[in-house]
Amino acid sequence: MSLTLINVLAAALIALAFVAVNAAYLVWAERRGAAFIQRRLGPVENGPWGLLQPPVDGIKLMTKQLVIPGGVDKILFMVAPVLAMFPALMSFVTIPFSENIVAHNMDIGLLVILAFASFAGLAILLAGWSSRNKYSMMAAIRAVSQTIAYEIPMLITAITVVLVSGSVDFIEIVHSQSGGFWHWNLWPLKPGLFNIFMPISFLIFFICSLAETNRAPFDLGEAESELVAGFHTEYSSMGFGLFFMGEYANIVIGACLTTLLFLGGWDCPFGLFPGVWWFLIKIYILIFTFIWIRWTFPRTTIYGLLNLSWKILIPLSLINLLLTAGFIKVFAP
């Protein structure tokens, strides 16, 4: 076995551990945050402040029987949860947490992650189709149409950032934002490049990240009041657990991408923390924002969801891309 393959496998195991811990304790954080917003206590029974609740829930999921309903396509039914989790693990392998902390740096890291993101729709479609359940199938169709609709403006916005930074390598993108928070791609008047449209790019990318992770108010694929539990209605035990971990892993990936593309990555404007800690602070602030939005805004309708993308975000992102290219041509040094 080659050294490169060993390194990739080790990186995948580290990514799996990182995803598992984050998925477990982001559930705890979300439950505590929801309780605070709704003036409840949240989980408090297992350990201080309920901190042992995630491992207890994990043990419960792993010890439950995996029930395969009659009439399902067994092969696709078993493959779908793995396919939902695998792209998230591979994405973490290419994400740099600082200039020196990256499992496997790639010159095309942004393209790789955006390519892996497209697998999410396939996993959802396989889960709905193989379940032979009308609610699961309807939820899968909703979720896939949502994924396709919001991948387009996300990709266009990512191209806008590539134009500004001149690279698809995450480390180069972060380097183009170094020198203080006023150099981040978030700001409209970045020194040396008068790009007044970057706040629009950030807003579009953030909205698309919410929609791509099926988070409220865009959780139409799991609308409990309409579709039981959505595309994973028939799943139990670790089949459900893999979908659950994949969802929270995608939340972390969305926060990482937003931080790398718009918030300077591990660049620290004050020099108070090492780069990796500053990077983690940024992504967890974004994750808290995801949680806050979920428990603040009501679920939209499927028509409103698709109209927002096809009629507003896609045209706006295209106009933004063209104007950004024009400004770079005119004003770039």
Curated annotation (Swiss-Prot):
Signal peptide: none annotated. It holds the Pfam family NADHdh. This is NADH-quinone oxidoreductase subunit H. NDH-1 is composed of 14 different subunits. Subunits NuoA, H, J, K, L, M, N constitute the membrane sector of the complex. Its EC number is 7.1.1.-. Keywords: Cell inner membrane, Cell membrane, Membrane, NAD, Quinone, Translocase, Transmembrane, Transmembrane helix, Ubiquinone. NDH-1 shuttles electrons from NADH, via FMN and iron-sulfur (Fe-S) centers, to quinones in the respiratory chain. The immediate electron acceptor for the enzyme in this species is believed to be ubiquinone. Couples the redox reaction to proton translocation (for every two electrons transferred, four hydrogen ions are translocated across the cytoplasmic membrane), and thus conserves the redox energy in a proton gradient. This subunit may bind ubiquinone. InterPro entries: NADH_UbQ_OxRdtase_su1/FPO (IPR001694), NADH_UbQ_OxRdtase_su1_CS (IPR018086). Its main location: membrane. The chain crosses the membrane at residues 8-28, 75-95, 108-128, 154-174, 191-211, 251-271, 273-293, 312-332. It is a multi-pass membrane protein. Belongs to the complex I subunit 1 family. One of its GO terms (biological process) is aerobic respiration. It is found in: Cell inner membrane. GO terms for molecular function: NADH dehydrogenase activity; oxidoreductase activity, acting on NAD(P)H, quinone or similar compound as acceptor; quinone binding. GO terms for cellular component: plasma membrane. It catalyses: a quinone + NADH + 5 H(+)(in) = a quinol + NAD(+) + 4 H(+)(out). It is an enzyme of class 7 (translocase).
